[in-house]
Amino acid sequence: MYQPISTEFPVYHRTSSFSSLMPCLTDTWGDLPLKVDDSEDMVIYGLLSDALTTGWTPFNLTSTEIKAEPREEIEPATSPVPSVAPPAETTTAQAVVPKGRHYRGVRQRPWGKFAAEIRDPAKNGARVWLGTYETAEEAALAYDKAAYRMRGSKALLNFPHRIGLNEPEPVRLTVKRRSPEPASSSISPASENSLPKRRRKAVAAKQAELEVQSRSNVMQVGCQMEQFPVGEQLLVS
């Protein structure tokens, strides 16, 4: 059966324990607004009084330190900025001189021309010079023709597709040799002074010998002319 709950609270009256409890509470929490004439305050007082009778006091509470949690600073979310790639440097700024194609049997001379050579198996692999050409392609073609004549279809060629085209032979570069200047028999006095002492003596002796020979030749011609009588004709057969 339903029993009505009594809403009447026990009435506590002020006793001597109130005066002993109040200093204990006020030392911990300060002045409490408990009024003797207020029924609700007396209810609170009664609860505190019962707690004191069981041996509880406010001083038994252990103060626990509350450790402040570290505050994490949250950075505002920012949209990633797209990285802009630096402009590509022009190839002309860093242009590297490309090396020419290397052909089989071709070597470049220090002065820029190209020489063609081939190893002759009949001469124990000795190098045979084929000539000097203006371009590397011409030198490579000259090597191909010589290699095909030596080894036939087994030859390793630079331009195998051109070997059967019957192209003319590449033009070789001819080196013009300077002809030696004829040594002059007469030497100027200035040049004689620049020659060493022994050299000057040899030159003087040579000149004297030439002069003696020329004089002897003149004398021989004069003697031969005197042998012919005056007025007679010389018949040449």
UniProtKB/Swiss-Prot annotation:
Chain residues forming the annotated DNA-binding region: 102-160
Biased segments, Low complexity type: 181-194
Q: Where is this region: Disordered?
A: 175-202
GO CC terms on record?
A: nucleus
Record flagged with keyword Mitochondrion: no
- Where is this protein found? Nucleus
Q: What induces it?
A: Induced by ethylene.
Any one Gene Ontology molecular-function term assigned to this protein's record: DNA-binding transcription factor activity
Question: What keywords sit in the KW lines?
Answer: Activator, DNA-binding, Ethylene signaling pathway, Nucleus, Plant defense, Transcription, Transcription regulation
Q: Which PROSITE patterns match?
A: AP2_ERF (PS51032)
What Gene3D superfamilies does this protein's entry cite? AP2/ERF domain
Expression (tissue specificity): Weakly expressed in roots.
Name the Gene Ontology biological process terms.
defense response; ethylene-activated signaling pathway
Where is coiled-coil annotated? Answer: none
Note one Pfam family from the annotation: AP2
**What family is it from?**
Belongs to the ethylene-response factor family. Class 1 subfamily.
Let me see what the UniProt entry remarks about domains: The AP2/ERF domain binds specifically to the 5'-GCCGCC-3' motif. The affinity of this binding is higher if the seventh amino-acid of this domain is basic.
PANTHER family, per database record: DNA-BINDING DOMAIN (PTHR31190), ETHYLENE-RESPONSIVE TRANSCRIPTION FACTOR 1 (PTHR31190:SF476)
Please give the function described in this protein's UniProt entry.
Answer: Transcription factor that binds to the GCC-box pathogenesis-related promoter element. Involved in the regulation of gene expression by stress factors and by components of stress signal transduction pathways. Probably acts as a transcriptional activator.
Q: What is this protein called?
A: Ethylene-responsive transcription factor 2
- Organism in which the protein naturally occurs: Nicotiana sylvestris
Recorded name of the encoding gene: ERF2
